[in-house]
């Protein structure tokens, strides 16, 4: 068994991955400001969105321990054909992940379920670190589609119930979401002035908000699995008992982070994603193990403080 110090974790990586991880570490070495502290609901650090397009699939589920999340794709009214309803797919990739973090962060910092949004879609995309390109296949169109999918997706949390039952909890995060479509179809569509979280989600968020360094997620915006690993590490390592490390076998890691890949492919790619996540979390104490990885109690990147609610 070998301790995985910050430099050891990249020993088995390709040279190009080692260079990328060194660059990620440099980006977060500067002092952190309050603007760099973002928040995410603890459930979203344990049950994740798809990594790739699920095409015509209308549902998605992931399990972590005794909890599961079920996503069901929604639909919208096509503004070009008011009498028709268009199905939208499941959200996937980095864009909806960063958007949900933005919404959670604004709710916590503003202490309100009513979230002010940047004045335009491009302004919000720049805040999240995405490049801006137009056209049918550009990043603006892709971002709009992913956020629409996220806003219309139905969330269900499955938790242990009494006497061996399973409890299904409907937990849609967004209650209201307005999109303005300008009359000029060539004009760039503007983002809504605000979105509104459901009362239930906002109440839960106040008690279960996990702080993290947004620069870490922004630096790995093209690696959604690495983003998920980073967020999971931020809330999980600090809760592991000092004298009882957590062994995550490959099958357990695959169940959480595998997505649609095969186990063989996952085992090839996971070390690079873990190294990318750890580049911004050098305090993470992780050891390679023949059956997977051993995780030890570690100081969180940002200490959790209770969210104070204004009366």
Q: How should these model regions be labeled?
A:
Residues 1-311:
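Charged, alpha-helix-forming regions
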């Amino acid at each position: 068994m070998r301790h995985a110090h910050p430099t050891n974790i990249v020993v088995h990586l390709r040279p190009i991955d080692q260079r990328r991880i060194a660059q990620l570490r440099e980006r977060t070495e500067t002092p952190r400001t309050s603007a760099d502290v973002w928040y995410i609901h603890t459930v979203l650090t344990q049950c994740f969105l798809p990594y790739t397009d699920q095409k015509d699939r209308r549902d998605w589920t992931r399990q972590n321990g005794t909890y599961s999340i079920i996503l069901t794709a929604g639909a919208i009214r096509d503004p070009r054909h008011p009498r028709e309803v268009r199905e939208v797919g499941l959200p996937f990739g980095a864009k909806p992940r960063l958007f949900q973090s933005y919404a959670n962060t604004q709710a916590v910092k503003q202490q309100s379920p009513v979230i002010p949004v940047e004045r335009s879609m491009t302004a919000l995309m720049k805040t999240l670190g995405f490049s801006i390109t137009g056209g049918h296949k550009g990043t603006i169109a892709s971002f709009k589609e992913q956020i629409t999918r996220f806003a219309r997706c139905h969330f269900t949390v499955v938790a242990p119930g009494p006497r061996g039952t399973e409890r299904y909890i409907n937990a849609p995060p967004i209650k209201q979401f307005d999109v303005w479509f300008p009359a000029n179809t060539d004009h760039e569509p503007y983002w809504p002035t605000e979105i509104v979280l459901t009362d239930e989600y906002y109440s839960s968020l106040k008690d279960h908000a996990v702080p993290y360094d947004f620069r870490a997620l922004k630096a790995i915006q093209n690696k959604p699995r690495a983003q998920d690993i980073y967020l999971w590490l931020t809330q999980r390592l600090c809760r592991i008992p000092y004298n009882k490390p957590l062994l995550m076998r490959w099958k357990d890691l695959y169940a959480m982070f595998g997505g649609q890949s095969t186990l063989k492919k996952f085992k090839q790619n996971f070390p690079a994603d873990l190294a990318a996540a750890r580049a911004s979390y050098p305090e993470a104490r992780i050891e390679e193990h023949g059956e997977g990885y051993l995780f030890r109690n570690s100081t969180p990147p940002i200490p959790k403080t209770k969210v104070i609610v204004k009366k």
